[in-house]
Regions:
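Nucleotide-activated sugar donor-binding and catalytic core shared by glycosyltransferases
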Residues: 1-163
Length: 163
């Protein structure tokens, strides 16, 4: 199963949802989409607006691949569970976010060259990246050390972003 999540930001992310819906018939995996506040309603995928956090975590845990905005919560869960993730950052110029901090996050992640983290900046790159990433787990899941592990991961990432 491929799980697509756009998070809970108040601006929609139509660009991602429309592209996923377009390529869904060509993929062999079931696709489940969390739409958030997006207005676009997919025709070729299962979808919902929001679910409780524990339900979203289960979707991520059971996914062969996650496609997401550059949200830290989703990224950390994918790292913890060893799930490949495609990051498709929201862009200010498309009115998907109030600034381009997600582009900055994606650029930092791209430099880390983690084989389970794939970065896509343009819609036309998405299908090829899905084919490369689906079912690919090159890194064992991180040990779950609870809150301390989460805090350490976030702290290390922030230090990386700000030099």
């Amino acid at each position: 199963m491929i799980f697509v999540t756009v998070g809970n930001h108040f601006q929609g992310f139509e660009r991602l949802l429309e592209k996923v819906d377009e390529i869904a018939p060509r993929l062999s995996h079931e696709i489940v989409v969390q739409r958030g506040y997006s207005k676009y309603v997919p025709k070729n995928t299962n979808h919902f607006d929001f679910v409780p956090a524990n339900t979203a975590m289960e979707y991520i845990r059971n996914a062969d691949l996650v496609i997401s905005h550059a949200g830290m919560g989703t990224l950390i869960l994918c790292k913890e569970y060893g799930i490949p993730i495609i990051i498709f950052p929201r862009r200010e110029k498309f009115k998907e976010h109030v600034n381009d901090h997600q582009m900055e996050i994606a650029q930092v992640l791209e430099k880390r060259e983690d084989p389970n983290i794939h970065i896509v900046y343009e819609e036309n790159q998405l299908e090829e990246k899905i084919m490369e990433a689906v079912g690919r787990r090159e890194i064992a899941p991180l040990e779950n050390r609870g809150r301390e592990n989460l805090v350490r991961t976030i702290t290390e990432f922030i230090k990386t972003c700000h030099g």
